């Protein structure tokens, strides 16, 4: 047998073995489809002369600008420290969207529109902005809230099965809402501004200066605006000290702690863990998202502060109080390590309500602030309301949000 014939027979004998090896080789899997996202258009360069100047690039200011741009208005967005800065009330990593809103129908009616707006933004962002989670509210003894639409009452007995990581009293009656959410704080503000296609400007904006000859407001760089929205929260007292005294509107401090669950412990993450407003004990918590830990804080702020200068560090006394609450409500977390902490501020009015009204003597200048604990998550609906007022000067102001209520 010649060499060529031997090689041919050897090749034919090896062919079945090669085929078997090929069959055993696993199919190559295609990589998972990327998260749906759309490319955002770049922000347009600021124009000198615009329809509306928005002062304050927090959640309410960002959504006000967003709605104004969608309505066809030319907008400039100013913030003295820059959008999403560390001093802002909007700078925290997460915020709660609570459908219960303490049983207050005025704010509960803003939840659906806000949820939908945050969800649309989240669907177009590179990272999630809205994380759905159930929310629970344990009323205080003096509370008699009527459950808003979409909110049910649950007994402590049933909740022990659904959320065993929380200690429930058998006689507790808790308000449970399915359509709650956590909003990604500072990241959500920046995404809103990107989606509005407005370039935020780090500019210190003074009280309004009206050029009476042109009937336009003069901006710091010589530009003009037909109207101004001051959505700068606690900084309103610096701009309008004669109207908004500290007794009427102020920055209030909350001390926040993030507690880290153990390795592989997912019972403190959504959907296993809800957001929880414990009015019975005066504390609130948000579940662990993105590994940031379970966030806990006392629901009632502990002091009035200067938002420009107060120290953003939490203190040991507040930590001891928070651990005491955890030992009663979430005993397995009571000794968990603190993985992050901060002192943050929010803006509160004397009535506890939002302020949304015109500046006296300036029918095209709007003041927006207050509603501590609510304004961030409801910012899409609040911003829509502000934009509607700008478009329709005859639109009536919500009586509970009127400036005159603070002047009494």
Residue ranges and their predicted role:
Residues 332-408:
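C-terminal catalytic lobe of FAD-dependent flavoproteins
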Residues 201-216:
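A conserved short coil-to-beta-strand element within the FAD-binding core of flavoproteins
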Residues 67-70, 128-130, 234-361:
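Active-site substrate-recognition segment that forms the wall
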Residues 55, 224-235:
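Short hydrophobic core segments
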Residues 1-14:
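N-terminal secretory signal peptides and thylakoid transit peptides that target proteins
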Residues 93-166, 170-173, 282-283:
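Dinucleotide-binding Rossmann-like beta1-alpha1 core, especially the glycine-rich loop
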Residues 70-89:
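Glycine-rich FAD pyrophosphate-binding loop
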Residues 52-76:
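N-terminal Rossmann-like FAD-binding beta1-loop-alpha1 element of flavoenzymes
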